Amino acid sequence: LYGYAQMRATVAKTMVNSKWPGYREDMHGTYQDKQIPNTYSCYGDPAMETLLQYGLKGMRDITGLNLKPTYSYWRLYKTGDVLKRHKDRPSCEVSTTLCLGYNNTNLKGRKNNWEKYDWPMWVDKTGGFNNRGVPINMKPGDMIVYRGCEIEHWREPFLGANHAQVFLHYNNVDGPYGENCVYDGRPHLGLPPAFKS
């Protein structure tokens, strides 16, 4: 090597794909989330996709399943936001929800104890619809692992100022969705939904 080298066609195809300009528009998130309109969310954020990959070994260990990552999605809930009861799509076969942090100081001086306020995620562990459900409280750094396509889950109206939550989704390679949903139809992690095949 004489101080420099030239390499040709070494960039991943996704970097020169015609969809690439859309990446810049999508990478900063949106307020167009259909589940919770006017609330900030971001699909495939590079930092969260790194967390998704980083958590893979632990997820395999805790579930005993041959998992592959599908996608990450994070949301910044605000006062009054509600997550309706639902089950997830096939790319969310094995899901996690991780509490990144929250601000409840807007509750100071109210009847409820704002310092102890947790916003639970409710799960219906029977897998059926419209049963009472079980609340699971989370502090920053806590994570819930659940079967997103089987377990109905929801959140009641949020009372605090804001609450950041990331969802990390995986599929069981040996399960009903197999390899079909790996990377949620994208060529690899770290890309926005415009790259889905």
Report each predicted region and the residues it spans.
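Conserved active-site beta-strand element of glycosyltransferases/polysaccharide synthases
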Residues: 76
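Short helix-capping and hinge/turn segments at secondary-structure transitions, especially at repeat
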Residues: 60, 64-65, 101-105
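Non-heme Fe(II)/2-oxoglutarate
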Residues: 1-63
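Catalytic core of non-heme Fe(II) oxygenases with the double-stranded beta-helix
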Residues: 79-150, 154, 162-166, 172-187
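C-terminal helix/juxtamembrane-tail motif
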Residues: 185-197
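A short coil-to-beta-strand element that immediately follows conserved catalytic motifs
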Residues: 64-73
